[in-house]
Regions:
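A short, conserved structural fragment
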Residues: 50-59
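Alpha-helical DNA-recognition elements
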Residues: 44, 48
Length: 119
């Protein structure tokens, strides 16, 4: 299952992933505080998420529920990045990430464990 969510839609999803089922009114209040969105803007973005199948709506109270997990979106976004920027090569992405920063001994050990798990 692949979803392309825009930054605005990810703001709505982030609330649902953190809070669980949440009313549209509460989402609008949170996003007004966080980024200054009006209620109308928030409801428009929620509608787009519903249309994409990322959010489910139940009544009464216009309760929103995430229908896709953060992990699914992370995987889809990562795969798109790999395809678009690294010619479909995961190892090129990893090399770019590792080449841009010095790793601590702990981070290196963690990466070794991850590689062993993938074998």
């Amino acid at each position: 299952m692949e979803f392309k969510l825009f930054d605005s839609e990810l703001k709505v999803m982030d609330i649902l992933w953190k809070e669980g089922d949440t009313s549209a009114k509460e989402i609008a209040e949170k996003l007004n505080e966080q980024v200054g969105w009006s209620k109308t803007t928030t409801y428009t973005v929620i509608k787009k998420c519903i249309d994409k199948g990322a959010v489910g709506r139940s009544e009464p109270g216009f309760i929103c529920r995430a229908l896709i997990s953060r992990k699914e979106v992370q995987e889809a976004e990562t795969n798109e990045l790999i395809d678009k920027m690294y010619d479909g090569s995961s190892d090129k992405l990893i090399a770019a990430l590792l080449g841009s920063k010095r790793l601590t001994a702990e981070e290196i050990q963690s990466l070794k464990k991850l590689v062993e798990k993938l074998k």
